[in-house]
């Protein structure tokens, strides 16, 4: 349901109108929930009700404390139903750069939010011919100790968030300011038993309290974190080269939030964050062929910092609670400077560092939003949500846009001379959305929704949705949802200045005329679209809980490197462009079970995911490589009020590589048949609180030392680290 007319939304005018209307009718008697964090809840909105749908999981601060991530929040997020870690394609490149994948839709269809605001630093990293980025993703900007909760939204419930949420949404909520002065200092270390695996050290602090009574409060945190790279030879040499192990990372973060309670019914938040994230190079090249690096450059860089991201964020948010409902107005700015060593962009050296010179890609995002929740009960009990969003993103990446040098060649309407191609691209999206949380009678909730987005390049897109929940009695509930979701083209795919090339082997398998290919950006792409459906049955009574959910995503228009010729360059090479592909299907089952073995003492929680189907209907290959099934099981034992332990077990099913050739090189060289067989990982976590302000933790991950090594034969493999020991302490006041 895409529309390409010239209609333009003016969201800033909408925001100003909402602000004027809201401030005119402030209520003095708004009720609070009595919590220190000043989060006020007036009415149950559609957004709140959607978080009760079967495709939603909540990770609490207590969950994180009991099962602490080693370095990245993805360590614990991956244990939710429907979630895995993988690359954005099935071709096996960048095997250890695994990001959050939800329901098999790939990391590029997972939208990351921090306090409800989109985070997009990973989009400053070049997008490769095969659809990968050399990035760790956006799940490592908040230290684990500073997280209040994480919401994992899968399927139709994520549609309200717009572009990029076709798989789902990860919403990371940081801790709010408190009414009394509190502070903490946390230390954490993870020490692998295998000396070839990188260890981790992390320290962070927080300070929170009133600056002027309860009218002005603040929260400040800082974080230092270092995870070393795996040894250069952790994996066996194949084809004359090593597949790199896991890259190391250094994080430095500082974040501040000041909250001003202007009146009992109005709160204004000011936020600022600065992060520096640098890598510790482990030798990875896009195609694991560092042995052909000129002068041995790749080998010489092991252990060095070859890329670093500087991320800054500014935010201003107004929350109002009125006689007619509540409102939220927000403006956020995010700037990412991505500084890295220059790399190749053609053929087998694409993505390989080829210079000792650094270049910087800059990505800026401006995001404004307004939302009002209005309860109505004249004829039927309901809460209507009206909202508007505006987002402007602009990219300046001179290195990636000029890396392919074809001086003197005319490629369609574009010059092959880098100096003639622009390094910049930008896009603006404006949106209006409507939702209604309707309770026609006791036990029934209906949530219709409609979102309209207008993109400066591809035009308009309608995203309707409908979710419902029906109480069946005796503890059973039936829940279902359907939504049309979309993803806009990224700024590399749609940039006229972004040129990639290959001398022949990288051309699509259907092109066999013996010459090379150029791949151009395309300003006429359509949005990717997926119709997501789910149906779930849940049971909850006396501490017991169980549920099973079927989901299906019918995906089309996925943007891929082109296979259709659009012309011939002046040097006789074929001209391709990024294009909208055909259809794909993702289908599966999710299940969960909670058993209170001993009430308030011993709980057993299990969730499982089984993939029925994941394939591109044109190529026959999966969208991404994930296990056929995944089971996560946790036994939580509260031994005393101060002492608790958790035993966790994860079983990953077989992971098969893609089977069908996509490039000419794969015709001449047989594709890898290497697959990762089913395996399990067991962990033990211990937590002890000496006082309410001093606690310690420790444990063992991968107790039985099951290791997986990455292979260098083109398969989608990765390193699963072996047994490791961790310890941590938190001191507060």
Where are these regions (language model features)?
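Short acidic/polar hinge/loop motifs at secondary-structure boundaries
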Residues: 118-154
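C-terminal beta-signal and adjacent terminal beta-strands/loops
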Residues: 122-125, 556, 561, 651-663, ...
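Extracytoplasmic beta-strand/coil segments of soluble accessory domains associated
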Residues: 74-121
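Gram-negative outer-membrane beta-barrel transporters
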Residues: 186, 439-445, 550-555, 566-661, ...
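N-terminal periplasmic accessory domains that precede
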Residues: 73-76, 98-101, 113, 137-140, ...
